[in-house]
Amino acid sequence: MKLLNQMELLLSTCKNRYVLTREVAEYAKKTPSPNAVILAIWLMARKTK
């Protein structure tokens, strides 16, 4: 549950939220590991700031 909250926080602080969400969705389809998806979200959020 805590990880979901972190993801929400990252998405809400991201300026280009819709692009980020689409990228994450594409990545999540390819990657079975939730941790890898969360890492990707974090990296993308850092990249867009």
UniProtKB/Swiss-Prot annotation:
Q: Which GO terms describe its cellular component?
A: chloroplast; DNA-directed RNA polymerase complex; mitochondrion
GO terms for molecular function, please?
A: DNA-directed RNA polymerase activity
**Domain of life, per lineage:** Eukaryota
What keywords are annotated for this sequence in UniProt? Answer: Chloroplast, DNA-directed RNA polymerase, Nucleotidyltransferase, Plastid, Transcription, Transferase
Q: Chief localization class?
A: plastid
Cellular location of this protein?
Plastid, Chloroplast
Give the transmembrane ranges.
none
EC number per UniProt: 2.7.7.6
Reaction it catalyzes: RNA(n) + a ribonucleoside 5'-triphosphate = RNA(n+1) + diphosphate
State if Zinc is listed as a keyword.
no
The family this protein is said to belong to: Belongs to the RNA polymerase subunit omega family.
The protein depicted here goes by the name Putative DNA-directed RNA polymerase subunit omega
Source species, please?
Cyanidioschyzon merolae (strain NIES-3377 / 10D) (Unicellular red alga)
